[in-house]
C-alpha cells in the first residue's frame, strides 16, 4: 500500500464500556472517559483494545516506544527525542524507521506497519523536538474534511506497509492531562517495549508485543514539568505513554500524563561503583508535547 493511499475516518458506535475508543480506518481514536459505576467494562483493568496502544519504533538495531496522537487536522507519532536523535540532537539515529502497532481488535493478528523516511520528514519540517524536555512529535498524516467526509492522508516520507481491518489505537488531545493537573499518589500504567529485558533471548518474551508496568506518581518537578514515577522502566521503554488512573463515584477515568524519558539509577558498591535501576522513572509532562503539536498549522 503506497503513501498516496487515502484513509477514511469515521466514528464507531461509542459503546459505554470502552474507556479508550473512536475509530479511524487505520486509526482507532481514543476517548478516555469514565466507565459508569457498577458497570463491568471488561474482565481486566483496561479495555482489551488499549493493550494495542503503544507503538514499537525500530531504527536500525535500536528500538524505542511511542504512541499516536490525533488532532483535528493532524496525526502525530509521539516519542522521546533520544529515540530519534543522537545526543547532539542534530543527527538522526538512522535515516529510516519502522513504526509497528497492533490492531484495536486483540483477536486480529495483522500489525499496523509504517515505514518512516526520517530524513525526508525532518527536511520537510514534520519532525519537531523539545530538547529541554526530551520529547519529539512526528507528523505522519494530514486530516481534511469534517464528519463522514473526513479523510486522512500520509505526509511525504510515510508509507503504509500493512494495516489491520479493525484499525489501531490512537489518542485525541482531549484525553491528555496537563502537568498542573497530575496528582501525586495516583496510579499509573506505563506502556512500552522494554527491549533490553531478556538479553539472553528468553523464549517466554515476545519482543514485538508491548509490556505494561503499574506504579504510582511518586513526585513532580514543577520547574521542568517532569513527573517521577515509582515504576521501573528499561531501555526500549523511552517514548512510551504514561496513563494515569483516577477513580470517583462514576468509575475509573484514564488520562495520558506523560512520555517516558529515562529511568533513575542508583549507585551501589564501595570500591567498584555499579549503577543499577532504582525502580523509579522520569516522564516528561504532556505540556511539551501539546506545545509542539500546536506549532503545526
What is each of the regions a protein language model found here?
Residues 1-20:
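N-terminal secretory signal peptides that target proteins for export/translocation
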Residues 22-34:
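Bacterial N-terminal signal peptides
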Residues 36-40:
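Boundary at the C-terminal end of the N-terminal hydrophobic targeting segment
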Residues 43, 253-297:
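C-terminal cap/linker of serine protease catalytic domains
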Residues 45-111, 117, 141-143, 179, ...:
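Catalytic histidine site
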Residues 66, 75, 79, 138, ...:
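Terminal peptide-recognition signature
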Residues 160-202:
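Short glycine/Trp-rich loop-beta-loop segment that forms part of the substrate-binding cleft
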Residues 229-260:
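Catalytic nucleophile loop of clan PA
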